[in-house]
A protein has these predicted regions:
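N-terminal glycine-rich FAD/FM-binding segment characteristic of electron-transfer flavoproteins
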Residues: 1-254
Length: 254
């Protein structure tokens, strides 16, 4: 089985600066693998047998130049890494990202695609589902467990009150939650070995992808201004306390 695990590079949260104008400054923010995609990479590594091949794939802009992140990905189990770096993908919205990923995986070849449920920055929860739709594949999201029985995958989805069990054949797309595993901490041997694994770097033209006319445009990201807390505590549920709470809520909404 050939498994492709798709991941996104996001800025390190602790390095993001909020400006006086309530915008975000990413100038000093280093790149890292999105936390939810670490679960996807680990899921692929746990699912694969010795006869299987795991490829990691990402698309994006300047963040993909980070060699430290490349080694980090490859130290976590994938046998090879594919990067599609292009200025058009610098701030791509989910649909364009999905179209680029779909074009790339078709060129690479695959049996199973594994995504994180959402990205660690915007958490739109769209890209994996869109890739499945573009490729006309079976897609399951909210995956909390994967087992392999021959050529069949047994998938668990944890819903609000139930656990849904689904049998699935490949090719397919899975979007996994953070509950599925605890991502490994790579050993020194794995980190050193990562430098010997192949890295394939493409541009948009290499996968016959170009940006479509935008249906929406990301014009900016702003942080809501902080407001002072009222520090009003009502510590009982008497009719008088409930009436007092209602008055405070009315004042806050007016």
């Amino acid at each position: 089985m050939k498994i492709i695990t798709c991941f996104k590079l996001v800025p390190e949260e602790q390095d993001i600066v909020v400006t006086p104008e309530y915008t975000l400054n990413f100038d000093n923010a280093d790149a890292k693998i999105s936390q939810f995609d670490l679960n996807a990479i680990e899921a692929a590594s746990q699912l694969a047998t010795d006869d299987d091949e795991i490829a990691a794939l990402t698309v994006g802009g300047s963040l993909l130049q980070n060699s430290k992140v490349r080694k980090d990905v490859l130290s976590r189990g994938p046998h090879s890494l594919y990067l599609v770096q292009d200025a058009q993908l610098e701030h791509a919205l989910p649909l364009d990202t999905a179209k680029a990923l779909a074009a790339a995986v078709e060129k690479i070849g695959f049996d199973l695609l594994i995504f994180g449920e959402g990205s660690g920055d915007l958490y739109a929860q769209q890209v994996g589902l869109l890739v499945g739709e573009i490729l006309q594949l079976r897609v399951i999201n909210a995956v909390s467990a994967i087992q392999r029985q021959g050529n069949t995958l047994v998938i668990e989805r944890t819903l609000e009150d139930d656990v849904e069990v689904i049998e699935l054949s490949v090719p397919a797309v899975l979007c996994v939650t953070s509950d599925i595993n605890v991502p490994r901490i790579p050993s020194m041997k794995a980190i050193l070995g990562a430098g010997k694994k192949p890295v394939n770097q493409w541009q948009a033209s290499d996968i016959d992808w170009s940006q479509s006319a935008p249906l929406a445009e990301l014009v900016g990201i702003r942080v809501p201004p902080q407001t002072e807390r009222k520090h009003i505590i009502i510590d009982n549920d008497s009719p008088e306390a409930i009436a007092e709470l209602a008055e405070h809520l009315k004042k806050a909404l007016n």
